[in-house]
C-alpha cells in the first residue's frame, strides 16, 4: 500500500498546523485506486504487480478538539454527520496535529480509529499524525509527519509521497491524478464537450480546444474582477478604519493637552492670587508699624532755622512758591516719581534763595550796618549754586 498527497493540499495542511494556537484535527478526503504494473524482462518473462494507492485530495479541519467525540473516546454520530455532511463517502482518513510529542498513536486515537472505520465503512481508513518540534532556544523548528494504517496486531506505517517534490530530474516531475471539482470547469466542459468529444469520450478536433480555453479564460477574468472588487472594498474599509482610529487618537491627545493647559493656568492663577495677598498684608503691616511715615512732619520755624544754620527773625514766615505744595501733592497722588523729583528740586532752589534773602536782611538790620556798608562785600558762586560771603 502507498499513499500520495497533492502539493497544494500538503502545503495548506502544514500552514494551518504551523499557525494554529493549539492542537487540532480533521478529516482527509480523496479516493483509493488500484494500480497494476506490468514488467517485462529480456527473457520475455512478464511480471504483474498490484498496488493500492490512497490519494489525498483535500482536508476538512474541525473547529476545535473533541468536536465529534467525548473525553472517553466515544464518537457522536450526529456531530460526525454535521461536520462531514455529503462528503462522508469521500473520507479516506483523518489527521491530528500535536506539539512536542512522539510520533506514536495514543490509546484514545486507536479507539477513535476503530469506531470511525466502523461508522464510515472504510476498511482502509488511514491516520495522519503531524508533530511540530522546536529546540530549547527556539532556533530550529521541525515539522514531521507519518501516515498510519492500523491493523489488528500493530500500526502499519505507510509511505507518503508528494508528486513534483523530490529531485529536479525530468522523471520525477509528473502530474497527480487529482480530480477537478470546480463548478465553472464542469459547466464549460458540459457546454462545449459535445463539439469535440465523441459518445465514447474521444476528442474530435483539436481546434475546438482553443474555444474551451478562451471560455475558461473569460470565466477566470470574471472571477478575478469580482475578487479584485471585493479586495478593493476591504482595502477601503480598512483605510477608513485606520483614519477613524487616527482621528480618535488625535482628539484624545488634544483633549489631554487642553486639560493639562487648563490645570496649569489654574495653578498659576492661584499662585498669583496668594502672592498678591501676601504682598498687600506685608505693606499694610509695615505702614502700621511706622505711623510717622503716613503723614509728613509739620513745618516749624525752628526746623527751618536749624536747617539753614542762620538766625532769622520770628516775624518772617517761610516763603513758598505759589502752587508748589499743591502741585507736589497732586503729582504724588498721580504716582509720577519724575514730577515729584522736579517739584522737590524747585522747592530746594526756592528755599536757598529765601535763605540768602534772610542773610542779607539780617546784615542790613544789624547795628554794624554802617560798617558793613563801608566794607565792600564780595559774593562768590559755589558749585552747588548757593551764594557765600567772602
UniProtKB/Swiss-Prot annotation:
Coiled-coil portions: 209-248
GO terms for cellular component: BRISC complex; cytoplasm; microtubule; spindle pole
Keywords for the protein's UniProt record, in alphabetical order: Cell cycle, Cell division, Coiled coil, Cytoplasm, Cytoskeleton, Microtubule, Mitosis, Nucleus, Ubl conjugation pathway
GO annotation, biological process: attachment of spindle microtubules to kinetochore; cell division; chromosome segregation; mitotic cell cycle; mitotic spindle assembly; protein K63-linked deubiquitination; response to ischemia
PROSITE patterns, per the entry: MPN
Region called Disordered, residue ranges: 288-390
InterPro entries: BRISC_Abraxas2 (IPR023240), FAM175 (IPR023238), MPN (IPR037518)
Composition bias, Basic and acidic residues: 355-365
Superkingdom of origin organism: Eukaryota
Start-end of Polar residues biased regions: 377-390
Family of this protein: Belongs to the FAM175 family. Abro1 subfamily.
Quaternary structure (record): Component of the BRISC complex, at least composed of ABRAXAS2 and the catalytic subunit brcc3/brcc36. Interacts with brcc3/brcc36; the interaction is direct. The BRISC complex binds monoubiquitin and polyubiquitin.
Name used for this protein in its record: BRISC complex subunit Abraxas 2
